[in-house]
């Protein structure tokens, strides 16, 4: 069956922002104007179409990335609405990995906020072209100029308005288009009814100057346009749009729009800008992967190429079971076809193919290059896996997910719960790559780890509501880590004789710090001093010991282990002997005195009235906080600090008390850092 929409008329975009900037409301209005929904839902009322999870509706926030498809001016727009809370940043990251463009929503009063900076960095990492929508122009305190200024100050980007607001706060009533040099006045409460007007007299000179600023940015992009401008020739709207599009596609420039999604003002202009300035799959570079011999393979965005896709999300649907979301980069595939999971080297069957709208679905028979869809039947596929035609061996770059920083022990309340809890936790860990489950080797307790207190709260809530599992939990604990600080070469020799065949394994391993590169194993054995069939056992022994830690049972991270020598016995050597020998070698590093405890450091941003600065800073200092920056804004101050996570439990209550409930804060994981000696000794003592 031929595709309904040509690739050049397809857009794959995300909506991203800080929490409460209006992402989901913006998406709802887009769906309303494109005819996808006929009643507008509100996040604060708990009836948003895109926030379909019970936990989202209760909290008025987006937790997962919801996907939908809309149509505007003969174009198909695939939209992913992403979370704004820092605990769910990974949802944004994996969505950006498969998108071609994005709309960044900025609060007109707050400007660029902490999570805006985080998701902007993620989008820059993936080289995603973006347009910017300054939302909530009707809000008390809204300032378009201030919001635009924060784009330069906090993001350091090349952005310029292509629109100007007519009025602000309660007086926000229209938009000036700097390309057309005309105005739009909204009639009533939305942009359903509007009229085209001349630019108000008091704005004409200002608008003209802003248009000139816009044109003068393009001397590096279009010499002909600059020459026309310098020679006093008229610059056509089409010419300007084309140059803006080219610069936006390269992520060299970011057009700025304005409006109020809640009041339905300016939303149609966003849709026009998505089509005018954001890329189709054909505008994006060909996808690059490699084969098992590490040779580069390039796939063009075309239906005629071999099927190539990347899985980016897994979720459990109560009616159809496991759903795997994937982006098709090349080729086509039909329902019922077999594909290869090239990452895991297993064959999978696409039982059903679905076009999703939040949690509702439409069955489709075939998918094409550029599509974002969900499949039923992929049993072994997880986020980051490459799906290909049978016998194809291309593997796309996978996804990197941060390690969780907070954990709790969990146990089922009843025998019935015990039977269900393992399956439920396993399904939840498939959906959340930053949610981990492990067993404490000393206490035999099941430990669950996540990115923050809200993340844990959502997991526990879903256990109860979706999987009907009641569980007891203890207080959240910090997920400490261990690491090496200097190079050491140690020996592990395991010999056992007990009559008959014995056990013999002998290794010499050099251990060294591997800063921010994870754990790495290198085999430098030459001449067969250890037969190659025992090398995987050495690696396995190290992996298990690294995960169990040495000082206090916390996983060892950022360690490079190089196997440099050893010996074997023709009769007595075995895989288990070499596995134990490797573990013994790692444990010897404790005697070298170069192991340390690492603690997670959080980036904390507090917004407080001026009256309480002393209280807030004094409290942060008492929590081992390091002040990074202070930024005054009207009658408030924004304080940025780095604070160990262990000092932040219960902080919300203390902050309320210190500021009479008038301050707010947000925090996100930044890095692991060596714990002070007295703190480390206390941690080790508790664990041992």
Swiss-Prot record:
* Cell division found in the keyword field: no
Q: Which Pfam families match?
A: EFG_C (PF00679), EFG_III (PF14492), EFG_IV (PF03764), GTP_EFTU (PF00009), GTP_EFTU_D2 (PF03144)
The biological process GO terms on file are: ribosome disassembly
Task: Please provide, in alphabetical order, the Gene Ontology terms of the cellular component aspect for this entry.
Answer: cytoplasm
Return the InterPro entries for the record: EFG_II (IPR041095), EFG_III (IPR009022), EFG_III/V (IPR035647), EFG_IV (IPR047872), EFG_V (IPR035649), EFG_V-like (IPR000640), EFTu-like_2 (IPR004161), G_TR_CS (IPR031157)
Molecular function per GO: GTP binding; GTPase activity; translation elongation factor activity
Q: Does the keyword Transmembrane apply?
A: no
Which sites bind GTP?
17-24, 81-85, 135-138
Q: Which Gene3D superfamilies match?
A: 3.30.230.10, 3.30.70.240, Elongation Factor G (Translational Gtpase), domain 3 (3.30.70.870), P-loop containing nucleotide triphosphate hydrolases (3.40.50.300), Translation factors (2.40.30.10)
Q: Which UniProt keywords apply?
A: Cytoplasm, Elongation factor, GTP-binding, Nucleotide-binding, Protein biosynthesis
Tell me the function of this protein: Catalyzes the GTP-dependent ribosomal translocation step during translation elongation. During this step, the ribosome changes from the pre-translocational (PRE) to the post-translocational (POST) state as the newly formed A-site-bound peptidyl-tRNA and P-site-bound deacylated tRNA move to the P and E sites, respectively. Catalyzes the coordinated movement of the two tRNA molecules, the mRNA and conformational changes in the ribosome.
PANTHER family, sorted: RIBOSOME-RELEASING FACTOR 2, MITOCHONDRIAL, TRANSLATION ELONGATION FACTOR G-RELATED
Family under the similarity heading: Belongs to the TRAFAC class translation factor GTPase superfamily. Classic translation factor GTPase family. EF-G/EF-2 subfamily.
The entry's protein name is Elongation factor G
